[in-house]
Amino acid sequence: MDIGVSTACLYPLETEKALYELAERGVKNVEIFVNSIDELEGQVLVELRRIIGEYGMNVLSMHPFSSPMETLFLFGDYPRRTEYLIDIYKRYFEVMAEIGAGVFVLHGAILSSKVPDERYMERYLRLFRLAKEFGVTVAQENICYCKSSSVRFIEDMIGQLGDEVRFVVDLKQARRSNVDPFRLLDIIGDKVVHLHVSDGDAGCDCLPIGKGSFNFNRLFSELEKINYDKAMIVELYRENYSSYDELAACANNMKKIYAVSYTHLR
């Protein structure tokens, strides 16, 4: 299991600085949240590559800043906008292929959108197939304010797209959607390719690992059932932790919980 941290946790710190802060704290596995299109080229990309190489980091995934644009652009009814965003995402795939990142996180259309399901599936499939050419998997994330917050919608994606759909399961987003994450894992099964993890309790849905009451032992048990051996990325909001050191501690805590759970499962 590759356990790490997302640079999104350090927002609004610039992406390369966020990556450096994690690297300095011994975090080896990361998700890079790209906050500007110019971070995929020029000196920023050079610096990202330098940090990755110098610290021996493993970039598991990328998350685009343009998620809020996906409703209007990727899934909208104006072809030029669709082509524009697909072209931008193609650049992500190129960079991901260069640095070895395998999963591209997609939010998709918001709940209030009137995007027909047929169009949604067609556009997702197009992006999925394009990414595959670069060795990248486009994975639909469950987001509380998006169509993917609905278990029914996720079931429809699986039913209509078959083996050409994959998913990111985010624990805090499941809490915010009032969806049991264990039920979600059971429904999606081996099509889960990425996890965003956080702790939580009745008072807060996003806490550092070990600061809430979430049953991580059960999580590992459920993941064992679907033979999940991929990434587990800590993703917290800046107001939910006290220091950058706490992010590294979260990753280490997850590793300890996993080690204990794995021993019991075996």
Tell what function each PLM region has.
Residues L19-E24, Q43-H63, F93-I99, F128-E133, ...:
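Acidic (Asp/Glu)-rich catalytic clusters
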Residues N29-V30, M62, R126-S213:
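Acidic/histidine-rich catalytic cores of soluble enzymes
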Residues Y11-L22, Y84-F93, D180-L184:
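Short, acidic/polar
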Residues T263-R266:
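Conserved small/polar residues in nucleotide/adenosyl-binding loops
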Residues A8-T15, F33-V44, L111-P116, C144-S149, ...:
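Acidic-and-aromatic substrate-binding clefts and catalytic sites of carbohydrate-active enzymes
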Residues E16, E54, T71-R166:
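Active-site acidic/histidine proton-transfer and metal-coordination neighborhood
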Residues A18-N35:
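Catalytic domains of carbohydrate-active enzymes, especially glycoside hydrolases
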